[in-house]
Amino acid sequence: FPGNVTAKVLFKLTDDNAIDIKYSATTDQKTVINMTNHSYFNLSGDPSKAATDHILYINADNYTPVDSTFMTTGDIISVKETPMDFTTPKSVAQDINRTDFEQIKNGNGYDHNWVLNTKGDLSQVAAKLTSPISGITLEVYTNEPGIQVYTGNFLDGTVKGKKGITYNQRASV
């Protein structure tokens, strides 16, 4: 892509237990910039356990489906009456093994973008994840139009974290 980009990311831990992430970038030519992060969470307190028992809410009536290579098709589809519907909180496990639903079958779980209803309004929660074991809740707020949710579908125990703990399939969301 053309141009030189200077990018900055600021991580701020707040007094009210929030992580505030701010991205900025400047360029000397028109170019494409797509800044993101890949944070995954297991709120149970035990990273050796799958996070599929976590309760997930996504403030989105639509999602963007992917093809068999995990590339978005460009379509925007309603979540209504599909396993992609998290407008009512439910466990990640509830529909994650739905092999009759192509979007989940192809990705071996969730690895999709939801089109948020928040319209950039930072006062509205975009997503909420809660561990029923620990009671810890993570709320996500964003001014972006979408949110990607990945359920660790291809973690296979070869990645080691703190204290040598291995991350198995679906160890985080």
Where are the regions that the model predicts?
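An exposed, glycine/acidic-rich loop-and-rim segment of catalytic or binding clefts
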Residues: 1-173
